[in-house]
Structure formats: structure tokens, C-alpha cells
Amino acid sequence: MRQIKSGFIIVALLALLAACSNDEEKRRYLPMLASNIENEVLVEVINGTRALSPTTLLRDSVFSVFGIESEKSLPVKVSVLEGKEVLSFRADLPDRTLMDLWDTDEGRRGEGYADSEITVQGAHIHLRFYYAFSALPRAELMRGGSTIALQTLEYQGQTINPYKRYGCFKIVLRRTPQGFTVE
């Protein structure tokens, strides 16, 4: 009986070690953090000249967002901007390995990007969100003093400067006979 227990423990330990060790190192997402994060994206979906109902798009499960860096579906909700319902999600922050950082007299600065894929009515829209980072000198010693914020996005090789107001970053997905455009 004792030999069976010992054998079982050895097999269990070997199985655990085999599961934990992998020839391929798993990629871990380590987002760039700051005390102030501006990564909310508002989305309006338009078919021709008519805005589609955000509530209906979510209810019918025909709108979703996937964060490429985090490898997760991102929560989407309905928000209101200037009296109009829009879809809203928080884009992935850039992974630390995707950040280019440098020091200045005013503190640390940086740029980076994170990719997301929006699926709307079966169409897949790949977007690259560009961020700017800034931190005051010795910001790590303060409760605050650093910001990472969305600046622009790229779609099909073109840079798009979205509508920005009240700290909001709004894009429009417009359905055309060829698919979607991003404005």
C-alpha cells in the first residue's frame, strides 16, 4: 500500500512538472501602466446614412471586440455621448515590450501601440491603437504624475485622427458595399 502511495505521488509530481514546463515559453501580457489611463474608445456604427442601435448590436451579438495583446474579449457597453447612444470599450494598453521610452528634462516620455479586432455583423476590422506616455520626474514616488493616452489609430495602413472631446476617443464604422470604413 505504501509503495502504491509513493508511486502515485511520484507520477503526480511528474505530471505537474510536465504541465508546468513547456518548450515554448508562454507570452505574458504586461500592459504599460500609468496613474491616468485614457483608453476608452467610443464607436458609432452607420449603415449608409443611418446609425445602427448599439443596444440592438449587443443584444443580437453582432458586435464584439478582441484585444490582441491581452488575448481576451473586451467588455463592450452602451454609453451616451452628447445625447447619442454609442458603443464603448477600453482598448488594450500596449505591452511593455511594445513601448519606446526615453528620458527628457521634463520626465519620461514614450510611444507604443496595441492591436484590437472589432467584429461587426460578421466583418472583422483590425485596428492598431497608438498611445503616448508621459511621466513627471520621479513619478514612481508619487501617487500620480504619469499618463498613457490614446492618440491615433491605424486601419489598413492609414492613420486616422479620431474625434476627441471630453477625454473621449470616438470612431465611426461606416458600412459600405465593400465592407466597413473607419473614420
Which residues make up each language-model segment?
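Bacterial N-terminal signal peptides that target proteins for export
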Residues: M1-F8
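Short, ordered, surface-exposed loop/turn motifs in non-cytosolic proteins
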Residues: R50-G83
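N-terminal onset of structured domains
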Residues: R27, P31-E38, G48-D60
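Extracytoplasmic cysteine-anchoring/structural motifs
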Residues: S21-I37, S70-E183
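Exposed beta-strand and adjacent loop surfaces of beta-rich binding modules
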Residues: E40, D60-V62, D115
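C-terminal motif of bacterial Sec signal peptides marking the signal peptidase cleavage site
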Residues: L16-A19
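A short, amphipathic beta-strand motif
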Residues: V41-V45
